Swiss-Prot record:
Name of the protein in question: Kappa-type opioid receptor
Assembly: Interacts with NHERF1. Interacts with GABARAPL1.
Gene3D superfamilies (UniProt xref): Rhodopsin 7-helix transmembrane proteins (1.20.1070.10)
Family label: Belongs to the G-protein coupled receptor 1 family.
Lineage top rank: taxon: Eukaryota
Species of the source: Mus musculus (Mouse)
Gene assigned in the entry: Oprk1
Length: 380
């Protein structure tokens, strides 16, 4: 979900000594406490000193968090994509959207090592091309994640509130087409990030920053414009659509005891709806804090206290952490994903369990069963 935070992380601060690290100077849409003004001059000396008292332990802690996010997120999301590709029964409309979300999260986790290095070195040592790529991946991840979650919510709304229309709309093919459209739409921002992104040497402090490069004479205007656009189109509007969809779904679920002609199918429908709701809720919880910081900064009410700067760092880390949480949620909340994960990790054990189950079913037929031979719930 989900995540221009990386641009912030790719931007070094004015100084970083063993005793204190300044907040990185950012040309992204994130708050900038020690940022250069429209003329390119660094903030006042008193302001810099005021914002400089950040414990050197903070970059180390955040680097440790990013290391966990990198391993869990990359492995977990790769496993999710493999499972959806490998197992035919997993190719449902909902899972096609989950594949898209996993792809975006897996891509952004690949930037974690670079972001960690910047936190520790307080400079961008990887060159201009890689800077453009990292910034672009950040914006792609942010927009594709929230757009995909929005479409998943709309998909659930149609499945719950308009089951007849769902037969035509909710197909794997149409879900794939929508995913392609999401990436094309996100490209309007991602390609712009490639064009505008780049490195800049700050000779006054002898560091290299990786950020969006706006014209110096119009820097403040473009910076504010970028923050407002991201806040509105990548957070406010999608979240409002999601809230409307789930409000209508809750009203529908409360008013009807049985959504379909089968109790088992109805259970699966509610189960998948709950899964999507949890994934969306976790995304909003992880990303709301940093968006609040953005809103506060845009209103000009920033603080240079140690607590504020430390909170800012960890809100960014929280946003990135979301990229590693979804595979864990699938494993705990969805029986089909859990079964496929176990089948991949423990193939011999799962094969023996299936053989045992098949022998029992051959002996005692259960006409009410809604599970296939592999033990998977039928897709809804």
């Amino acid at each position: 979900m989900e995540s221009p935070i990386q641009i912030f992380r790719g931007d070094p601060g004015p100084t970083c000594s063993p005793s204190a690290c300044l907040l990185p100077n950012s040309s992204s849409w994130f708050p900038n406490w020690a940022e250069s003004d429209s003329n390119g001059s660094v903030g006042s000396e008193d302001q810099q000193l005021e914002s400089a008292h950040i414990s050197p332990a903070i970059p180390v802690i955040i680097t440790a968090v990013y290391s966990v996010v990198f391993v869990v997120g990359l492995v977990g999301n790769s496993l999710v994509m493999f499972v959806i590709i490998r197992y035919t029964k997993m190719k449902t409309a909902t899972n096609i959207y989950i594949f898209n979300l996993a792809l975006a999260d897996a891509l952004v986790t690949t930037t974690m090592p670079f972001q960690s290095a910047v936190y520790l070195m307080n400079s961008w040592p990887f060159g201009d091309v890689l800077c453009k790529i990292v910034i672009s991946i950040d914006y792609y991840n942010m927009f594709t994640s929230i757009f995909t979650l929005t479409m998943m919510s709309v998909d659930r709304y149609i499945a719950v509130c308009h089951p007849v229309k769902a037969l035509d709309f909710r197909t794997p093919l149409k879900a794939k087409i929508i995913n392609i459209c999401i990436w094309l739409l996100a490209s309007s921002v991602g390609i712009s990030a490639i064009v505008l992104g780049g490195t800049k040497v700050r000779e006054d402090v002898d560091v290299i920053e990786c950020s969006l490069q706006f014209p110096d004479d119009e820097y403040s205007w473009w910076d504010l414009f970028m923050k407002i656009c991201v806040f509105v189109f990548a957070f406010v509007i999608p979240v409002l659509i999601i809230i409307v969809c789930y409000t209508l779904m809750i009203l529908r679920l409360k008013s009807v005891r049985l959504l379909s002609g089968s109790r088992e199918k109805d259970r699966n429908l509610r189960r998948i709806t709950k899964l999507v709701l949890v994934v969306v809720a976790v995304f909003i919880i992880c990303w709301t804090p940093i968006h609040i910081f953005i809103l506060v900064e845009a209103l000009g009410s920033t603080s240079h206290s140690t607590a504020a700067l430390s909170s800012y760092y960890f809100c960014i880390a929280l946003g990135y952490t979301n990229s590693s949480l979804n595979p864990v949620l699938y494993a705990f909340l969805d029986e089909n994903f859990k079964r496929c994960f176990r089948d991949f990790c423990f193939p011999i054990k799962m094969r023996m369990e299936r053989q045992s189950t098949n022998r029992v079913r051959n002996t005692v037929q259960d006409p009410a069963s809604m599970r296939d031979v592999g033990g998977m719930n039928k897709p809804v």
